[in-house]
Amino acid sequence: MIDRDPIDVFNNTLVPMVVEQTNRGERSYDIYSRLLKERIIFLTGQVHDGVASLICAQLLFLESENPSKDISFYINSPGGVVTSGMAIYDTMQYIRSPVSTVCIGQAASMGSLLLCAGEAGKRYATPNARIMIHQPSGGFQGQAADIEIQAREILALRERLNRIYVKHTGQPLETIERAMDRDNYMTAEESRAFGLTDSVIERRALSDDGDTKSSS
């Protein structure tokens, strides 16, 4: 018997379908596709190339639909592959649409970098969310020359990630380097004080026209 990816099992069997009434009758969507119509994107679980490709495609699609309207990006992730996360990060910076980020559950490692990379003033965490930052890690094997090459690469990645955190948090480089030396867990309030987020949100308020919007 072939073991199935638990994420595939989840997506294929546990994601609910919603039915929408249209002029042409009923139309069914999986819940994430329906939320995409409302410009809502989710990152759940590990960050890898497959997930990154889907999220980048959704960001580009929503920009093509309306480049001036906000995109809401909900994050509940332990992190994952650095280069995959950087693909999402670069796409967030590339598109014209403002990206509002919200941490629900956890945003660790690359998840925290994507959280802080949202539009300034529109980066949120829910009260019980946990945020964790740390330096990149990896295991290498092979000839000494190969290990040396990989070590230089991971040090370069660390420097690049540090400078991205500096850009989005406003913290000096020395503070970021110290904070990321080991696993550094933060509460929602601590992440706000550090500059990873802008507000802690408990519930959404109703705007004057009846639409919901985030409140801090």
From Swiss-Prot:
It is found in: Cytoplasm. InterPro entries: ClpP, ClpP/crotonase-like_dom_sf, ClpP/TepA, ClpP_His_AS, ClpP_Ser_AS. Its EC number is 3.4.21.92. It is an enzyme of class 3 (hydrolase). It holds the Pfam family CLP_protease. One of its GO terms (cellular component) is cytoplasm. The active site is at S109, H134. GO terms for molecular function: ATP-dependent peptidase activity; ATPase binding; serine-type endopeptidase activity. GO terms for biological process: protein quality control for misfolded or incompletely synthesized proteins. PROSITE patterns: CLP_PROTEASE_HIS (PS00382), CLP_PROTEASE_SER (PS00381). Keywords: Cytoplasm, Hydrolase, Protease, Serine protease. Belongs to the peptidase S14 family. Fourteen ClpP subunits assemble into 2 heptameric rings which stack back to back to give a disk-like structure with a central cavity, resembling the structure of eukaryotic proteasomes. This is ATP-dependent Clp protease proteolytic subunit. It comes from Rhodospirillum rubrum (strain ATCC 11170 / ATH 1.1.1 / DSM 467 / LMG 4362 / NCIMB 8255 / S1). The lineage of its organism: Bacteria, Pseudomonadati, Pseudomonadota, Alphaproteobacteria, Rhodospirillales.
